């Protein structure tokens, strides 16, 4: 099992910082530019990456990320291209944790063990399967353990204590804490209070909780860290910058740089 997450969180804790983790879809808007985008996110200060593999029916995603999936698929991106990009990123950045956020069908289509092995070979540290809750995850979990990849679970804000306990016991890497129920996107802003859930996760010794869903502003990152989260994930807001600058690559990369720097600065206590 890679220990990049453990190392990252320990280093951030020493420096009294939280993690800023941007999400983008691999291959959006095309293979060549996708590598440059991910490269820009890391060089601008992202602490870890959360990446999607394009899928035709992303159920948990709002319109922004659905459109990113469509752009990537229409550009002709294949799963092999996605693994090529991951391998290049890992070669350039040996220490950054890389997580994949995807759907069960994509994993099944490749055979679970084969897919996890490919991910490991490409330098992936963790896999979160958005449509598989912890209590249905045994076949994925067992293979993740065997292959040496962290299986990430989502903790919804309305989760029962027994669900939170299960997530804490079964998960590794980090815990993806939802700031609210619903689909992803900055269309609906993140609403705290997640303090109670964070307290429970700490009590159950869960992998470090990172807050996601609707995180688009530095002050939301600050609030998340103040509430006790180890970091924040921002997907739709990052992807919107790509969407809004499709025809102007330099402006897109400049805006992504500014956005990551600003969000990362908000994690400093």
UniProtKB/Swiss-Prot annotation:
Gene Ontology cellular component list: cytosol
Keyword Ligase set for record: no
Catalysis: reaction(s): (1S,2R)-1-C-(indol-3-yl)glycerol 3-phosphate + L-serine = D-glyceraldehyde 3-phosphate + L-tryptophan + H2O
Pathway linked to the protein: Amino-acid biosynthesis; L-tryptophan biosynthesis; L-tryptophan from chorismate: step 5/5
Entry superkingdom: Bacteria
Protein purpose: The alpha subunit is responsible for the aldol cleavage of indoleglycerol phosphate to indole and glyceraldehyde 3-phosphate.
HAMAP family: Trp_synth_alpha
Official protein name in the record: Tryptophan synthase alpha chain
Organism for this UniProt entry: Francisella tularensis subsp. tularensis (strain SCHU S4 / Schu 4)
Organism placement in taxonomy: Bacteria, Pseudomonadati, Pseudomonadota, Gammaproteobacteria, Thiotrichales
Gene symbol of the encoding locus: trpA
């Amino acid at each position: 099992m890679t220990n990049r997450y453990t190392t990252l969180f320990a280093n951030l804790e020493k420096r009294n910082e939280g993690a800023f983790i941007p999400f983008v879809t691999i291959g959006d808007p095309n293979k060549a530019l996708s590598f440059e985008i991910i490269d820009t996110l890391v060089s601008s200060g992202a602490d870890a990456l959360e990446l999607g593999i394009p899928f035709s029916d992303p159920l948990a995603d709002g319109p922004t990320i659905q459109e990113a999936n469509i752009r990537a698929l229409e550009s002709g991106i294949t799963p092999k291209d996605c693994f090529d990009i991951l391998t290049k990123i890992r070669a350039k950045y040996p220490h950054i944790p890389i997580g994949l956020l995807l759907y069960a069908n994509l994993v099944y289509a490749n055979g679970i063990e084969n897919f996890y092995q490919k991910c490991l070979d490409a330098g992936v540290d963790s896999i979160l399967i958005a449509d598989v809750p912890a209590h249905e995850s045994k076949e994925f979990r067992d293979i993740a353990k065997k292959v040496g990849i962290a299986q990430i679970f989502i903790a919804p804000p309305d989760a029962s204590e027994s669900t939170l306990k299960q997530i804490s016991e079964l998960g590794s890497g980090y815990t993806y804490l939802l700031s609210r129920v619903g689909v992803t996107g900055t269309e609906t802003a993140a609403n705290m209070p997640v303090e109670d859930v964070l307290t429970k996760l700490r009590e159950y010794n869960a992998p470090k909780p990172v807050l996601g869903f609707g995180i688009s502003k530095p002050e939301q990152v600050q609030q998340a860290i103040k509430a006790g989260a180890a970091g924040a994930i921002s997907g739709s807001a990052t992807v919107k910058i790509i969407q809004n600058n499709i025809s102007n690559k330099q402006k897109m990369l400049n805006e992504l740089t500014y956005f990551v720097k600003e969000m990362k600065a908000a994690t400093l206590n």
